């Protein structure tokens, strides 16, 4: 598994702030520098937020990778809107994504609504599932459960995440609308 959290050893001072705040105890200090234990890290980003030396950062794909596709779709999570103070109109964010160069914006919230309806029907039909069910929507929570609370693994709903569903739905619609192959989207 490729992790999204990495350490810059040149910036690390071995202060242990990240260690004290890691919910899964995935960080150790070795030779005066922090080291992330990949089998315990859940990629929650707590260490990124608390490091006073900015030695922990998140790895993400380069924006230029979008140029490999003929048609690009942004799929903003509903949590994105909460990052802006006094946001009265989500269209401001959606239009901003288009201005960044995306060809289309598909709101993940639409997929969330469709998926929650499906999940509700499934829960009613499958009464033998352990309750309460836990949404698989947050990968950090799923990894936290698998590391710290393995007895709850069978409580994770056996459905794809809203983000995955949104990506599938958006791509299928774009194929219909544009005539492009799925590989081009």
Label each residue range with its predicted role:
Residues 60-185:
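Iron-sulfur-associated redox domains of electron-transfer enzymes in respiratory
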